[in-house]
Curated annotation (Swiss-Prot):
Enzyme class, UniProt record, top EC level: hydrolase
Region annotated Ubiquitin-binding domain (UBD), chain positions: 269-284
Superkingdom of the source species: Eukaryota
Segments traversing the membrane: 22-42, 104-124, 138-154, 183-203
Name this polypeptide is given: Rhomboid-related protein 4
Residues on Cytoplasmic side: 1-21, 125-137, 204-316
Highest classification ranks of the organism: Eukaryota, Metazoa, Chordata, Craniata, Vertebrata
UniProt subunit comment: Interacts with BIK and STEAP3. Interacts (via C-terminal domain) with VCP. Interacts with ubiquitin and ubiquitinated proteins.
Enzyme Commission number: 3.4.21.105
Keywords: Apoptosis, Differentiation, Endoplasmic reticulum, Hydrolase, Membrane, Mitochondrion, Protease, Serine protease, Spermatogenesis, Transmembrane, Transmembrane helix
Compartments reported by the entry: Endoplasmic reticulum membrane; Mitochondrion membrane
GN (gene name): Rhbdd1
Length: 316
């Protein structure tokens, strides 16, 4: 494991400040653990990024399948980590409260693996159908595919209404597709296939057989989940909620946490935050060449990385 020797990471500091602003005790446990794991691997990468990212060439042709486990928890830089983990905070507070910690952890683990598998299938299909072998070499890292899958779940459990994306009202059920197009249009360096893979995995859960398969695999472990400090409630839709307790027996009120979450988001919905971020990205890319790597970071092929590195040294 290689420890980073970089200077101050502004994105990481902003993420930590927002976590402490909400209060660690107010963040559901699996959401908090997911943030901690991603921050840990950012500070202590298991392998260099080029040996952690997933591509058809590396995973399938070279049988390096451990990349499926490594790629979701590695990020290109501190801003990539910041945008992904702030989005995880927003989704985790809502979904973990509704689904329960154990089921939410099960979802995170399953989605992390499946988004990588679907990404590889999409890249392989694109390479074969379009006769473009470069698709097999595109190497991606980051948690954004899982976040798009969670966004599908969030829209499924809270249907109806409209969101505003780049000034256009979009029905909530189509918000994921609009965000996919908006992010790809405004930041073309992002992994379109990685984000699309997340949406497809989310649809497999809400509209397809994935949830039933997960129910069957969980089986008796989920049905016996009533253990110390948590009260689980089950119905034909799986675990529907839980209640955590402080050590003195007082319940943790995550509903109040969700309301307080508006304080540090300035009362903006996730879509409104996305719109502001995209507009800021457009402005920033129009005024500077050295901005942070955009949301949904995708590693270019090795030759492109070498060319960019040489170009940077030539300019010094």
């Amino acid at each position: 494991m290689q420890r980073r020797t970089r200077g101050i990471d502004t994105g990481l500091l902003l993420l930590l400040s927002q976590v402490f602003h909400i209060g660690i005790n107010n963040i559901p446990p699996v959401t908090l653990a997911t943030l901690a794991v991603n921050v840990w691997f950012f500070l202590n990468p298991w392998k260099p990024l080029y040996h952690s990212c997933i591509s058809v060439e590396k995973c399938y042709q070279q049988n390096d399948w451990q990349r499926l486990l490594l790629s979701p928890v590695h990020h290109g830089d501190d801003w990539h980590l910041y945008f992904n983990m702030v989005s995880m905070l927003w989704k985790g507070v809502k979904l973990e409260k509704r689904l329960g910690s154990r089921w939410f952890a099960y979802i995170i683990a399953t989605f992390s693996l499946l988004t990588g598998v679907v990404y590889l299938l999409l890249q392989f299909a694109s390479a074969e159908l379009m006769n473009q072998p470069d698709f097999k070499r595109n190497c991606a890292v980051g948690f954004s595919g899982v976040l798009f899958a969670l966004k599908v779940l969030s829209n499924h459990y809270c249907p109806g209404g409209f969101v505003n994306i780049l000034g256009f009202p979009v029905p909530n059920r189509f918000a994921c597709w609009a965000e996919l197009a908006a992010i790809h249009f405004c930041t073309p360096g992002t992994s379109f296939a990685g984000h699309l893979a997340g949406i497809l995995v989310g649809l497999m859960y809400t509209q397809g057989p994935l949830k039933k398969i997960m129910d069957a695999c969980a089986g008796i472990f989920i049905s016996n989940a009533g253990s110390s400090g948590q009260q689980y409630h089950f119905n034909n839709a799986g675990p529907s909620g839980y209640q955590n307790r402080y050590t003195d027996g007082r319940p943790v009120n995550y509903e109040a946490t969700y309301r307080n979450y508006d304080i540090y988001t300035a009362g903006l919905s996730e879509e409104e935050q996305l719109e502001r971020a995209l507009r800021a990205s457009i402005w920033d890319r129009g005024n500077t060449r050295n901005g942070p790597i955009p949301y949904g970071f995708r590693l270019p092929p090795e030759e492109e990385m070498r060319r960019q590195r040489l170009h940077r040294f030539d300019g010094q």
